Amino acid sequence: MAKFALNQNLPDLGGPRLCPVPAAGGARSPSSPYSVETPYGFHLDLDFLKYIEELERGPAARRAPGPPTSRRPRAPRPGLAGARSPGAWTSSESLASDDGGAPGILSQGAPSGLLMQPLSPRAPVRNPRVEHTLRETSRRLELAQTHERAPSPGRGVPRSPRGSGRSSPAPNLAPASPGPAQLQLVREQMAAALRRLRELEDQARTLPELQEQVRALRAEKARLLAGRAQPEPDGEAETRPDKLAQLRRLTERLATSERGGRARASPRADSPDGLAAGRSEGALQVLDGEVGSLDGTPQTREVAAEAVPETREAGAQAVPETREAGVEAAPETVEADAWVTEALLGLPAAAERELELLRASLEHQRGVSELLRGRLRELEEAREAAEEAAAGARAQLREATTQTPWSCAEKAAQTESPAEAPSLTQESSPGSMDGDRAVAPAGILKSIMKKRDGTPGAQPSSGPKSLQFVGVLNGEYESSSSEDASDSDGDSENGGAEPPGSSSGSGDDSGGGSDSGTPGPPSGGDIRDPEPEAEAEPQQVAQGRCELSPRLREACVALQRQLSRPRGVASDGGAVRLVAQEWFRVSSQRRSQAEPVARMLEGVRRLGPELLAHVVNLADGNGNTALHYSVSHGNLAIASLLLDTGACEVNRQNRAGYSALMLAALTSVRQEEEDMAVVQRLFCMGDVNAKASQTGQTALMLAISHGRQDMVATLLACGADVNAQDADGATALMCASEYGRLDTVRLLLTQPGCDPAILDNEGTSALAIALEAEQDEVAALLHAHLSSGQPDTQSESPPGSQTATPGEGECGDNGENPQVQ
């Protein structure tokens, strides 16, 4: 007995179930055919499938000869229009068996309400339900062949009255074994049938659109017919043939596309697709006839004009989508670059600081240039006024007596004179003109001290000598030295190197009785009185009649108002710059004279003590005050005037960390008694043991390193600490031992409390430093002092050395300057 083999290469038919639940009583519906419905509405006969299986089995599975069996005609297939449900494609028919012995074997299946999935274009997958149905059918056929008798030649095998679809093949017929080419042909035919079904579905979807167009054209036709009676303009009659020709071409193109679609589809006349296509074709023919009948109407041309832009708009809308996608992809790369630059944020910080410094420098240069322009204008006006005043003065001097100038001066004291002198400070005395001309106009000098170590073993020079500076004027460096400096000096005067930051000391005055001291007389310099016989009296009159120029007075008044306001209130920078510029021009130049400074101080004192304290302690960009400059340039007469105000901050340090007291320890005096009196007064008013903010040196160490023996004695007399140490732990004795200052070493050893055994930060003593510097005499003196405990150094002291004794050269408790013996 031949077995029914299932071909696994058959495509999946897509049916979810083939055996629906039978009707009540186990009977099938008489209208159910022996077929399977595909998702596209195509019915496949199971007999055809069994025939394909028999062809695959070949001649080895041929049945025994017997009478052919007759087949009962199948029920007609329903049309394609009724094969689909409204919602989705479903299988409306299934297989059932008419065997009475097993009525419910094939009734176990899925519920009949499941929806069919559309056919997927991917590779076919085996359907277990179809395989189960085929195996069940094969088994029943084998059972039927074993139990049935051979039928007569003239009769056919009776079939089930229900038409269950079971049929037995003719046993006497031996079909020829098909080849692989025939099987491939069958598969291609089935695939072509499925493709045809898809095309029919696509054409069926276009039918509603065509019907909508037909309705729109009919409405347009009705509108055109309604407007035929209206008179047409003359312009439309000329363009009528062109619009009619355009409308005909559009109609022909639409009809051609529809006919081509019908030719490809070729639906049957009895199918719904065929009927709809026929209706569409008829509607188009009617439309062509109606359009032909309206050749003379202008409204037909408007239909053609409205139909063209629809297609163009569809194409224009598709273009921007691709461009927008490209635009959105561009910023991603830019953001990645911005993220990479975040790792380099450390580099722009230095560049930004440099830019800030450059901006500040530019602002400063602009301010200086503005001040210079204003000063130039003032000088030009003052020159013209001075020439006029000089001409008038010469005419008056020819006719007046010797008492006339002083009477004029007394009269000018009561009434302000409109004439202006070249300086911003004015005086009615005849000598004021010459004094102002002696002061050269210049900008604010910004200078710091340039440190240069002295040569070991060099002896201090006896000639006058001032410090060397590195000044910063208008953004450039310039070096300046005193005119009294001698080339034979081995020592170089220094201050401190310019630091990156600034530090200022506290204005700590030693007492409030500075006015009780006897200030040194101001040096007249180049200022000469034109009448020597009346020298004393005009000088006293000039001191009582000091006035400021109107412009400087206004600036001082504005500055006084700012000082009285709270700190949070905005200040006027122009007034501050003007006052500072004039103050440093008068008091801080190398050739500045004491008389103009005294006149300006008197004029500022009249406006208020608070303004006087502010002006006296004004500092430039390097932290230097007028006291720093006067001491550094050796203008101790000006320094005495500043100390007389009682508001001068003696201990204030500049940006290099040095105070005016430390600079005074390096200054050489010109007039021995007068200048030394000012220096001693400065030492007594300040803190002689104050240390520089950078190196920690004291004024005593600076004086020793520069060979100022007289300043060393004065500092010791004012209470300088001999054992004070700097930042490296060095003392004044170590400094003197290193430079070979033998006289200074003797002077230091005579001071009570001097400890030569002190060690610095490296554990080195003064004796070791002297031996290392090859200072044999100093080393022998230190060794003798350490060996004997208290050697007699008085007999070995040179005649020029000074020894401080109790009660001589010491400062008083009230801060008065000592008297030099």
Curated annotation (Swiss-Prot):
This is KN motif and ankyrin repeat domain-containing protein 3. One of its GO terms (biological process) is negative regulation of actin filament polymerization. ANK repeats lie at residues 622-652, 656-690, 695-724, 728-758, 762-785. One of its GO terms (cellular component) is cytoskeleton. InterPro entries: Ankyrin_rpt, Ankyrin_rpt-contain_sf, KANK1-4, KN_motif. Residues 128-150, 237-261 have a biased composition (Basic and acidic residues). Residues 77-88, 151-181, 388-400, 494-507 have a biased composition (Low complexity). Pfam families: Ank_2, KN_motif. Residues 181-230, 367-404 form a coiled coil. The gene is KANK3. The modification Phosphoserine is found at residues 152, 160, 164, 167-168, 177, 271, 280, 293. Residues 1-36, 58-184, 224-333, 385-547, 784-821 are annotated as: Disordered. Transmembrane segments: none annotated. May be involved in the control of cytoskeleton formation by regulating actin polymerization. Keywords: ANK repeat, Coiled coil, Phosphoprotein, Repeat. Strongly expressed in breast, liver, lung, skeletal muscle and kidney. Residues 1-10, 787-805 have a biased composition (Polar residues).
